């Protein structure tokens, strides 16, 4: 029988006020219900808000002089997660679908992120300077203060690492956090939020509500007490939240869609580029990543060789249940995502694209009840195919010939998105030209799409607003207050 999980309110798991639940199924076998979670609504969000406001008013957590103490709590949380990493990784794979080694990597990302932000304890310092106003001497101080109650809206693709990107800096800054996980992958986030309280976060500072976006989600983004919203999601969802936030002049951090391009030059290590793009760039997490490689522009004089290398690497990937040791790529997370990916593939083929690897649903008893797709590689994809212009959130990789770097950059910049980008080249001149001209928030050079706590993460154009990770990610959760104090008359 499936385990019943609760929302987290005041440090405890509680049911929804209406008492309803909904199932979370295993995307590798939809007959398996991994857990039942509360179907929260507007009133559940309101009581979570009241709980958080009470905690901000009556606990030590938001005090500007307690940052070292908060840092110790975050470090303790990272240690608790590390002790349960294998258990949590298996739960993550069962609810999300990704292979176990990727789930372990995601838990490592969370641990590293909380460890990184814990190091800001005692370092949230302001400034002091002196100036004069006529005959008066003025002491000018600044201090960093928490925003207050913040909301995190999480996606299904990386429910653990993106939890850390939002929750760790928000808590380090002294805020309270109201967390809404994705309905298809909320279970690990529920356990993590319970563990925050075990680590020493006061009751009410980290609450979690599960439920539909149409009710719980809407109340969350429109409630006047919520002062900041952090979302990872689609561009359309981000624009909706941005408009709602504007009504209350709320702070926002929006990490939205991406159609990340990679340019492969003729002086690149083609074998390394092909292996990295396939194994770490496009098909990791079944292609369900904002920063996965979604468009590849290859110099024409090496296109045939490179496309063969990519197709060979893709054909080697073993699709299956993420808990099985031999699996390289698990299922997609849900039926709608698979249908959307199949549409992109069908559209490209209808317009004349050539499939050189994979494609379609794998056959066999082990695949019948899961959301599986074979990794697909396409060449000769017409420029009007939808996959060049919209985000395909799954395992399809289109390759296009370009004459030179200039055309490659032009094609790369033709998308409305501007999240990540990459170049493979042995030429410093080419690399610097790409870095200077590419319209993207991030660039990877001869490497996989890597996210690390020390480096700010975010995009331009339709890929979002604000930055997560790094010192910039912490600044998104702080207000600056300035104090002008008269201290006496200036000497003449």
Segments and roles (model prediction):
Residues 1-29, 55:
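Hydrophobic face of amphipathic alpha-helices that form TPR/SEL1-like repeat modules
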Residues 30, 34-124:
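Glycine-rich loop-to-alpha-helix module at the N-terminal edge of alpha/beta enzyme cores
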Residues 30-31, 70, 92, 114, ...:
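Residue-level signal for inorganic ion chemistry
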Residues 32-35, 226, 263, 318, ...:
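Conserved C-terminal structural/oligomerization subdomain of aldehyde/semialdehyde dehydrogenase
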Residues 34-40, 54-61, 152, 262-265, ...:
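Short, well-ordered beta-strand elements within core beta-sheets of diverse protein domains
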Residues 56, 60, 78-85, 89, ...:
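Structural signal for hydrophobic packing residues in well-ordered secondary-structure cores
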Residues 126-272, 402:
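Rossmann-like NAD(P) dinucleotide-binding subdomain of oxidoreductase/dehydrogenase enzymes
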Residues 228, 236-382, 445, 491-492:
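ALDH superfamily catalytic-core signature
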